[in-house]
């Protein structure tokens, strides 16, 4: 639409130049045309806490630790839950005397099982010092539930996808393909167990049994973590587990979550539990800001991220396939993750 038709259709309120825009704001604020007004950037505004009404003069704080995205090894970033950033965030919140309670905001379909276990351990240590309350977003499944299950209280939305208590492992093998192509690879070792698993060699029954044993061991540990956190027997958890996916509403009925409510509700509960009347909230972890990527996400045409360029070049469907391949490539070791994507229509 042109700017004139956009106004006619009610998509915008007024067509104006930048100086007219500033003049309108001054008029709205009751300022003279020669006055100036304070403004903040969209980037700074996005980083301010908008989750609850905070008293920034208060000495007490409620920490909100965000665990968003696939769980993987390494540091992590705004789109992935990394061991390094999560453990450091929990340690900082735990050691800060001004922080009275911690709300762990989980929005993750899971991922690396070892990383999930290490984050679980950090939460267990934190609980000994101050309360940990979980607020589930769209997803808190598999590894996402793993890191949530031992919280003092778990809140979920009615539509949260949770549960998926199960694990799996991936062993890609190209031996048949390479044989057809006439490509042969050989390993030289002192004994049959000395060499690493090779994607170019047929999977032996012994190695398959070894891998299966590892998956079962991690699954048993997963069940025990949930049983301890939710005060159930392992058999009770197993009857709800085996990869089953539950909505937040159903998860409450079967005891996997405690209450239905959003982040506001979880923060309010944390404050009430610690008898904290006035408080500010503080977000963890802190990540470096990618200015260009942020503006690209806002849809500004002159700031385009590398991902947006790739999507434009290969098309939406091919881009989705590339993303799936990236996920598979990033999965190393045993996984506590949703083995599929859920789309809402």
Predicted regions and their residues:
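Charged, glycine-interspersed solvent-exposed loop segments at helix/strand-loop junctions
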Residues: 1-24, 175, 179-270, 274, ...
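Flexible, low-complexity junctional segments that flank or bridge functional domains
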Residues: 1-61, 73-75, 88
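Intrinsic disorder and flexible/low-complexity segments
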Residues: 57-62, 66-92, 96-97, 286-345
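Active-site proximal loops enriched in glycine and acidic residues that flank catalytic Cys/His/Asp
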Residues: 66-69, 106-108, 136-138, 151, ...
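C-terminal intrinsically disordered, low-complexity extensions immediately downstream
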Residues: 268-297
């Amino acid at each position: 639409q042109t700017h004139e038709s956009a106004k006619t259709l009610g998509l915008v309120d007024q067509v104006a130049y930048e100086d007219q825009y500033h003049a309108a704001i001054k008029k709205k604020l009751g300022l003279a045309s020669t006055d100036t007004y304070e403004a903040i950037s969209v980037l700074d505004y996005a980083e301010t806490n908008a989750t609850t009404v905070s008293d920034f003069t208060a000495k007490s704080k409620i920490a909100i630790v965000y665990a968003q995205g696939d769980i993987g090894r390494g540091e992590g970033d705004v789109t992935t839950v990394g061991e390094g950033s999560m453990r450091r965030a929990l340690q900082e919140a735990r050691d800060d005397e001004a922080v009275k309670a911690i709300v762990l905001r989980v929005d993750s379909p899971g991922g690396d099982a070892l990383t999930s276990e290490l984050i679980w351990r950090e939460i267990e240590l934190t609980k000994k010092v101050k309360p940990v309350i979980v607020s589930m977003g769209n997803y808190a499944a598999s590894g996402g539930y793993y890191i949530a299950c031992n919280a003092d209280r778990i809140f979920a939305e009615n539509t949260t996808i949770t549960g998926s208590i199960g694990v799996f492992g991936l062993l890609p093998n190209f031996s048949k393909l390479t044989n057809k192509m006439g490509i042969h690879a050989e390993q030289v070792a002192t004994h049959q167990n000395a060499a690493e698993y090779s994607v170019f060699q047929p999977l032996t029954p012994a190695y398959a049994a070894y891998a299966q044993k590892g998956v079962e061991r991690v699954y048993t540990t997963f069940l025990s973590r949930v049983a301890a956190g939710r005060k159930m027997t392992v058999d009770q958890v197993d009857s709800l587990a085996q990869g089953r996916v539950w909505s937040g509403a159903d998860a409450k009925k079967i005891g996997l979550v405690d209450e239905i409510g959003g982040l506001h509700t979880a923060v309010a509960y944390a404050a009430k539990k610690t008898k904290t009347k006035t408080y500010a909230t503080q977000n963890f972890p802190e990540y470096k800001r990618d200015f260009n990527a942020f503006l690209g996400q806002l849809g500004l045409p002159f700031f385009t991220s590398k991902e947006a360029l790739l999507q434009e070049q290969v098309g939406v469907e091919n881009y989705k396939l590339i993303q799936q391949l990236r996920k598979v490539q990033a999965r190393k070791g045993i996984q506590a993750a949703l083995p599929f994507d859920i789309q809402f229509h």
